[in-house]
């Protein structure tokens, strides 16, 4: 009897949520108010992190900016302040260091308050084939792109759970859903970030903390210094995404409390095809679009800190 009741309840919920999703396809969700929210953005010193900071500043949020690049972070701080009377706090933080994340997190709690929207955006790209990637760069990719999410969530999630109010945002990648040639360390670290964020979303649902929202973002390559030189065979068919376009999409997804955001929508087709066609057909599609060779001309953004690290290692 219980199985019959459970089945009836399941189909009832399934039908309700299906109809609800159809309604929201036609009628946009009501966007939440983020004024007064304390928003922490990692990797805020440039690119997507900077643009997201500007969006939140325009809507009255208090900004907490983290980046290892202090100069870039202060420039973001300056741009944010141009939006008017905005509370903004900038901190230098190496997100690959658990000790430093916890230390700076304690400083934020003391000086600003409990973070209510956490955006794990910091990321690094090596852009080398697996056999040509030094061990320390593999570790760096995982520490920044995935493991740092564990430390930031450990630091700020307890207060959200206690208040049953908050929002976790994971900036993963389309490379966190589909493996890409030349991005073995980056892709696997983004798979890890996606898996962690999705598991955490389910954990929060199971403990009935439904007011702590999750948004998991998987964009195609963005036109930033991080993917400098990256291109496909037919840029008009599969172009790199503009930063402002992606930032606006992410900001809207947060305001609408959307759980999954994959950009562009063409990527949904690729994910569907991955499930139904043979690996050889997927490889043929990648060759046609030039995705398999997109990293061949990659140059990337080489930071001073990375150059210094490389020099020190060679001297040892």
Swiss-Prot record:
Keywords: NAD, NADP, Oxidoreductase. It comes from Mus musculus. Belongs to the short-chain dehydrogenases/reductases (SDR) family. Substrate binds at residue 173. Pfam families: adh_short (PF00106). One of its GO terms (molecular function) is oxidoreductase activity. InterPro entries: NAD(P)-bd_dom_sf, SDR_fam. This is Short-chain dehydrogenase/reductase family 16C member 6. NAD(+) binds at residues 40-64. It comes from the Eukaryota. SUPFAM superfamilies: NAD(P)-binding Rossmann-fold domains.
């Amino acid at each position: 009897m219980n199985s019959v009741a459970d089945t009836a309840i399941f189909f009832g919920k399934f039908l309700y949520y299906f109809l609800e999703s159809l309604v929201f396809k036609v009628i946009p969700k009501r966007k939440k108010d983020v004024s007064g929210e304390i928003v922490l953005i990692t990797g805020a010193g440039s690119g997507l992190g900077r643009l997201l900071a500007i969006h939140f500043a325009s809507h009255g949020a208090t900004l907490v900016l983290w980046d290892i690049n202090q100069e870039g972070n202060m420039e973001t701080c300056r741009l944010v302040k141009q939006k008017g009377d905005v509370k903004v706090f900038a901190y230098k933080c190496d997100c690959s260091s658990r000790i430093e994340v916890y230390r700076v997190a304690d400083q934020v709690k003391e000086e600003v308050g409990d973070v209510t929207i956490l955006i794990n955006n910091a990321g690094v790209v090596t852009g080398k084939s697996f056999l040509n990637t030094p061990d320390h760069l593999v570790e760096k990719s995982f520490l920044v792109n995935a493991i740092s999410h564990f430390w930031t969530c450990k630091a700020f999630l307890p207060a959200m759970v206690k208040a049953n109010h908050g929002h976790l945002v994971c900036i993963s990648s389309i490379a966190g859903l589909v493996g890409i040639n030349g991005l073995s360390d980056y892709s696997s670290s983004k798979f890890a970030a996606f898996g962690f964020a999705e598991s955490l979303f389910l954990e929060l649902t199971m403990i009935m903390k439904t007011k702590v929202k999750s948004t998991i973002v998987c964009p195609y390559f963005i036109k930033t210094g991080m993917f400098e030189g990256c291109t496909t065979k037919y840029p008009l068919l599969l172009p790199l995404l503009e930063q402002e376009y992606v930032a606006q999409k992410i900001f809207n997804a947060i305001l609408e409390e959307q759980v999954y955001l994959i950009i562009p929508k063409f990527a949904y087709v690729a994910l569907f095809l991955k499930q139904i066609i043979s690996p050889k057909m997927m490889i043929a599609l990648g060759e046609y679009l030039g995705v398999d060779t997109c990293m061949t001309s990659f140059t990337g953004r080489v930071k001073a800190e990375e150059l210094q690290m490389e020099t020190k290692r060679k001297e040892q």
